[in-house]
Regions:
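Short, surface-exposed coil-to-beta transition loops
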Residues: 21-27, 52, 88-92
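Charged, amphipathic alpha-helical segments
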Residues: 60-84
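Acidic/histidine-rich, surface-exposed loop or edge segments in extracytoplasmic proteins
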Residues: 37-54
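Short, well-ordered, aromatic-rich surface patches in folded extracellular/luminal domains
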Residues: 1-19, 77-149
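Short, solvent-exposed coil/turn segments at beta-strand boundaries
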Residues: 30-37, 100
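Short glycine/serine/proline-enriched coil/turn segments at secondary-structure junctions
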Residues: 18-22, 47
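Second-shell loop/turn segments in exported
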Residues: 53-57, 106-109
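Residue-level detector of buried hydrophobic side-chain packing
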Residues: 29-31, 67, 95
Length: 149
């Protein structure tokens, strides 16, 4: 396995489709430099007094190397073309980062989207299950509090 580049950094954004508050949520996962990661979670539309929760986490070297290899193979090898399909509603995901001295940017809704599925799955898998569980619980509590209003 080739060692990951020293300059490997990545930011992945996921955003739920349009829904009335408090059911919308979005999050950003940042990886690198090195074995550091964090997830920033918005349990509602950002701004307007909605909270923002940040959870740092450690990234294990092996899955990070695997992600780096995937990014080199699946992401750096293509020109990403945004599809203007006019779709309204569904969730969106996009990412940007640096690998091998190359900056890359993948917009939401692109051609060859299926090539990104293993990359996005690997990014989400770097966040420990305990962190996801904590954020899910906080989000459910936020929705209950919102509904209790």
């Amino acid at each position: 396995v080739e060692s990951k580049a020293k300059d490997f950094t990545l930011q992945y954004d996921w955003c739920a489709g349009s829904m009335p508050p408090p059911h919308h949520y979005e999050y950003t996962i940042r990886i690198g430099p090195g074995l550091e990661g964090e997830i920033v979670f918005h349990p509602d539309y950002p701004g307007l007094g909605a909270p923002e929760w940040t959870e740092p986490f450690d990234v294990a070297e092996e899955p990070l190397d695997a992600l780096y290899a995937l990014v080199k193979e699946q992401v750096l090898s293509r020109e990403w073309v945004k599809v203007e399909d006019g779709t309204v509603g569904g969730s969106l995901e996009w990412m940007s980062g640096t690998a091998d001295g190359q900056h890359f940017q993948v917009p939401s809704r692109v051609e060859e989207e299926e090539a990104l599925e293993p990359v996005y799955a690997a990014i989400k898998a770097l966040v420990p299950e305990a962190v996801w569980a904590k954020l899910r619980a906080r989000r459910e509590q936020y929705e209950r509090d919102y509904d209790a209003g």
